[in-house]
Amino acid sequence: MVVMARVPRPERPDLVFEEEDLPYEEEIMRNQFSVKCWLRYIEFKQGAPKPRLNQLYERALKLLPCSYKLWYRYLKARRAQVKHRCVTDPAYEDVNNCHERAFVFMHKMPRLWLDYCQFLMDQGRVTHTRRTFDRALRALPITQHSRIWPLYLRFLRSHPLPETAVRGYRRFLKLSPESAEEYIEYLKSSDRLDEAAQRLATVVNDERFVSKAGKSNYQLWHELCDLISQNPDKVQSLNVDAIIRGGLTRFTDQLGKLWCSLADYYIRSGHFEKARDVYEEAIRTVMTVRDFTQVFDSYAQFEESMIAAKMETASELGREEEDDVDLELRLARFEQLISRRPLLLNSVLLRQNPHHVHEWHKRVALHQGRPREIINTYTEAVQTVDPFKATGKPHTLWVAFAKFYEDNGQLDDARVILEKATKVNFKQVDDLASVWCQCGELELRHENYDEALKLLRKATALPARRAEYFDGSEPVQNRVYKSLKVWSMLADLEESLGTFQSTKAVYDRILDLRIATPQIVINYAMFLEEHKYFEESFKAYERGISLFKWPNVSDIWSTYLTKFISRYGGRKLERARDLFEQALDGCPPKYAKTLYLLYAQLEEEWGLARHAMAVYDRATRAVEPAQQYDMFNIYIKRAAEIYGVTHTRGIYQKAIEVLSDEHAREMCLRFADMECKLGEIDRARAIYSFCSQICDPRTTGAFWQTWKDFEVRHGNEDTIREMLRIRRSVQATYNTQVNFMASQMLKVSGSATGTVSDLAPGQSGMDDMKLLEQRAEQLAAEAERDQPPRAQSKIFFVRSDASREELAELAQQANPEEIQLGEDEDEDEMDLEPNEVRLEQQSVPAAVFGSLKED
């Protein structure tokens, strides 16, 4: 049933209620200022016709005009009602008016302003929308403007109205200056490049600016350079040249790009000569090869494009004489640029390090064939390079400069250059010494021998103030008198051109200054020997020995002793012995072998045999362990030759005690072999028995085979059994050592059957021992397998009528280890009586009787 109620006022529409509405109407009458009651009523009427719903909202807002909830729902519902209608429908105007009425009370609500502005944007009413945005910004506090501006800017960018957008952005940047990049991008897109460049320049100069896009100051600067250099006709308000040159001093690691940008600006502006000047300035100022390559390639490309453009213009308009001259000029300019590249690149490297000697030499080579440029380059080099900062050897510049004059026949100029070089305060004495040597070689090349000697004597003369060679506080001119390089050259010249006394004086002076080397000492002694001053030469050796210690004195001693023996032989034997003892006193083991052999040779040839043997004996103790084996071999050989092989027994015993197991084993075999040759079988067997203790049967099978062959030849069944017993004993000893080592390794790394980490937490202690026992049992089983099986005593039943063959078979089964000797040996043993011993007569080797060497 529908209840119709008329309102007495004519402007108010009739209110129509349904029976379901009465409870809500009654509640509203009781609480007409309750928002919740009205919202419940509105929620209930959501399915009602739109006019009825709007009427209900209007009734509620008339009583509660300041309710944000009611206005928000009402406006949202009104916008939804016209969403699918044409924007020219009058209903849109009603909704707009509804929003305007709402802002009478809700002008501080940014959400309503945003919805209204978006609604107007959808209608396409540009001016009305812009004014509404402005009203919203005026109505809202400044703290809420950040909610309006994103939509406002989107609205400005959505219409091709650059002036309106620019004005809006300018206002926005006052609120948010950090968003300047967004404005700059818009200006670029709208082709307002002049203002974009201005804004970008402002941003670059602002040190406090932080890019929202994460760009560095250099990236922004690079954008500015690209913008102003590529659009010279559109950017008029900025001084492009000053801006880019300011960047050259600011961003020194990107000079190549900035120079190219500046040249590109002038090229696009049509100022080609100015662009060429910029390129020339760039290639003369850049400091890195990368920047130079970048600028040079751009420069070459520019020249190529100019030539191509000129040729294209000439082909289109016809060639004239003036055009040909201009084209030839451009081609010549381009060729000159290409030919200058190595020199320009060298200039870049010298700007990086003007004290780089090698680069100066390369620069001279680039001027090959142009003497004036070479002289200028050398002059600039020697004036620029600081010897204390130089990379390389600075004296080579002076030497090469003088050599250039010499090659061109200007000897006086070359001498002047070298004379100036001798006055330069070099960092190292060796540099000045090299200059003096070059002075001498210059005179020698032109056969001015006296002048060469004069120069070197001048170089080695004592200065007014003496200084130590390595005293860096003194100039090198005061220290060059101790330079071995100059003295060596002077000594060579004196030997070739001077007298005996002058040469001797030079060598004596070298020794007095204590700057000699072992080779200098030997040369001096050889020089004296050539002139038959033998004792003087020996004194020279003595002076050299006093200057050096081991190992530097090794060559001097070897030469000295050799020369002394060859000179005197056995005539001054005691003096020779004293020299050897002096040489061996403090001699390192590494160098002792040669001296001992020389000493022993002296005693053998001129002295006593027992002295020689004593020297060999000392040598075996004095040399390095690695040389002891060789020394013992020599000792044994010489002892056998002098005294006979029987005298070598003590040497063998000592060698076996001293040498390592490997060499001792070899000595034992040789010792035993010698005893066999002498017929001392028991001695040889004792040696084999002793040596067996250091012979593991698993690795030294050759030794055991040798012993076995020995026993087969010279032994019997008992000795062979003893050998086998010893072998088993030794093998058991080595197996025990292996088992012990394996158990120790097992504690660290675990066994192959498992590890403690694999066990349960509660069983680690017990299973640790279990694993060790398993591993020990396994190793013991392997050792037992390696040993020959033991004889097992068995009880056999033998018939009384058993045949001889059956008894032999049972005996073989009862003792499988019984040694089967050959048939020949069995027959020999059967011929012998139990108490008989076979005696063999052997000849004594001639080596037993030694003697001294005959003269």
Curated annotation (Swiss-Prot):
InterPro entries: HAT, HAT_Syf1-like_N, HAT_Syf1_central, HAT_Syf1_CNRKL1_C, Syf1-like, TPR-like_helical_dom_sf, TPR_rpt. GO terms for biological process: blastocyst development; cerebral cortex development; DNA-templated transcription; generation of catalytic spliceosome for first transesterification step; mRNA splicing, via spliceosome; transcription-coupled nucleotide-excision repair. The keyword DNA damage applies. It is found in: Nucleus. HAT repeats lie at residues 15-47, 48-80, 90-122, 124-158, 160-192, 198-230, 235-268, 270-305, 369-407, 498-530, 532-566, 571-605, 643-677, 679-713. Keywords: Acetylation, DNA damage, DNA repair, mRNA processing, mRNA splicing, Nucleus, Phosphoprotein, Repeat, Spliceosome, Transcription. Residues 808-855 are annotated as: Disordered. One of its GO terms (cellular component) is Prp19 complex. The modification Phosphoserine is found at S851. The keyword Phosphoprotein applies. The modification N6-acetyllysine is found at K420. Residues 820-834 have a biased composition (Acidic residues). Associates with RNA polymerase II, the TCR-specific proteins CKN1/CSA and ERCC6/CSB, and XPA. Identified in the spliceosome C complex. Component of the XAB2 complex, a multimeric protein complex composed of XAB2, PRPF19, AQR, ZNF830, ISY1, and PPIE. Identified in a pentameric intron-binding (IB) complex composed of AQR, XAB2, ISY1, ZNF830 and PPIE that is incorporated into the spliceosome as a preassembled complex. The IB complex does not contain PRPF19. PANTHER family: PRE-MRNA SPLICING FACTOR, PRE-MRNA-SPLICING FACTOR SYF1. Involved in pre-mRNA splicing as component of the spliceosome. Involved in transcription-coupled repair (TCR), transcription and pre-mRNA splicing. Belongs to the crooked-neck family. This is Pre-mRNA-splicing factor SYF1. The gene is Xab2.
